């Protein structure tokens, strides 16, 4: 089960790297995301004076390169890099909320693909947000470029629990560029957690020759087997 693996992700050497360097470096890495999963979207990082929000993923949307052939809905990206007139934060609806997680869903024209923003509150002054695509029983997450920012370990653990317990997901996919300098370290870390490399041509991932995909299969216990 995923809970039995979460402690290992907190202590893995990849996530330990987030403590190295200063806060300025962590913020820089949080905003440098890999090329988009949708051909029509762009990612970004935003912050507020009273709260730090680390957006740890590109603005993923239901597009032809990410498990859907429906055009990505127009977005106004925080930081002024969007060219649309609609701000996704204004039209998003709350899907799930507790004392730590706040998950919102952005409207799309495809009822089979859902764009989620999973915000984890670490402290009163810091939040980490993962943007993901929920499609066909799988949750798809794109790792940010560079070392994962401070706080990503705890937020990622909470995300995996949410995928298992609330979404009842069958798989959680991660992806990152094949040419990353820390590719070997990421492969070791996530393999240790139970993730497996997705081979080219897998029916559940888009054709991205520039990206490496890994998958974690969520296996739920049969209630009758607990005794």
UniProtKB/Swiss-Prot annotation:
Gene3D superfamilies (alphabetical): 3.40.630.60
GO cellular component: cytoplasm; nucleus
Source domain of life: Eukaryota
Induction entry: Induced by a ribosomal frameshifting mechanism in response to increased levels of intracellular polyamines.
Molecular function terms, GO-annotated: enzyme binding; ornithine decarboxylase inhibitor activity; protein-containing complex binding
A Gene Ontology biological process term: cellular response to leptomycin B
SUPFAM superfamilies: Acyl-CoA N-acyltransferases (Nat) (SSF55729)
InterPro entries referenced in this protein's UniProt entry, alphabetically: Acyl_CoA_acyltransferase, ODC_AZ, ODC_AZ_sf
Key words of the record: Polyamine biosynthesis, Transport
Subunit structure: Interacts with ODC1 and thereby sterically blocks ODC homodimerization. Forms a ternary complex with PSMB4 and OAZ1 before PSMB4 is incorporated into the 20S proteasome. Interacts with AZIN2; this interaction disrupts the interaction between the antizyme and ODC1. Interacts with FAM171A1.
Described function: Ornithine decarboxylase (ODC) antizyme protein that negatively regulates ODC activity and intracellular polyamine biosynthesis and uptake in response to increased intracellular polyamine levels. Binds to ODC monomers, inhibiting the assembly of the functional ODC homodimer, and targets the monomers for ubiquitin-independent proteolytic destruction by the 26S proteasome. Triggers ODC degradation by inducing the exposure of a cryptic proteasome-interacting surface of ODC. Stabilizes AZIN2 by interfering with its ubiquitination.
PANTHER family per UniProt: ORNITHINE DECARBOXYLASE ANTIZYME (PTHR10279), ORNITHINE DECARBOXYLASE ANTIZYME 1 (PTHR10279:SF8)
Similarity field: Belongs to the ODC antizyme family.
Protein name (Swiss-Prot/TrEMBL): Ornithine decarboxylase antizyme 1
Organism: Rattus norvegicus (Rat)
Gene name linked to the record: Oaz1
């Amino acid at each position: 089960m995923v809970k039995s693996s979460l402690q290992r992700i907190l202590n893995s050497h990849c996530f330990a790297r987030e403590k190295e360097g200063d806060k300025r470096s962590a913020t820089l890495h949080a905003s440098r995301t890999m090329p988009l999963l949708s051909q029509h979207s762009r990612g970004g990082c935003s912050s507020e004076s009273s709260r730090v929000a680390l957006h740890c993923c590109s603005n993923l949307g239901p597009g032809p390169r990410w498990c859907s052939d429906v055009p990505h809905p127009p977005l106004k990206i925080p930081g002024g890099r969007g060219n649309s007139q609609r701000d996704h934060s204004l039209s998003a609806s709350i899907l799930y909320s507790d004392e730590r997680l706040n998950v919102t869903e952005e409207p799309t024209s495809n009822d089979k693909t859902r764009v989620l923003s999973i915000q984890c509150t670490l402290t009163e002054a810091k939040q980490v947000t993962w943007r993901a695509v929920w499609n066909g029983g799988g949750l798809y997450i794109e790792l940010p470029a560079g070392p994962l920012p401070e706080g990503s370990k705890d937020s990622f653990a909470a995300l995996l629990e949410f995928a298992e317990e609330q979404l009842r997901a069958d798989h959680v996919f991660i992806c990152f560029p094949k040419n990353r300098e820390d590719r070997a370290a990421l492969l070791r870390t996530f393999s240790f957690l139970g993730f497996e490399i997705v081979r080219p041509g897998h029916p559940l991932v888009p054709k991205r020759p520039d990206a490496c995909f890994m998958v974690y299969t969520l296996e739920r216990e049969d209630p009758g087997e607990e005794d």
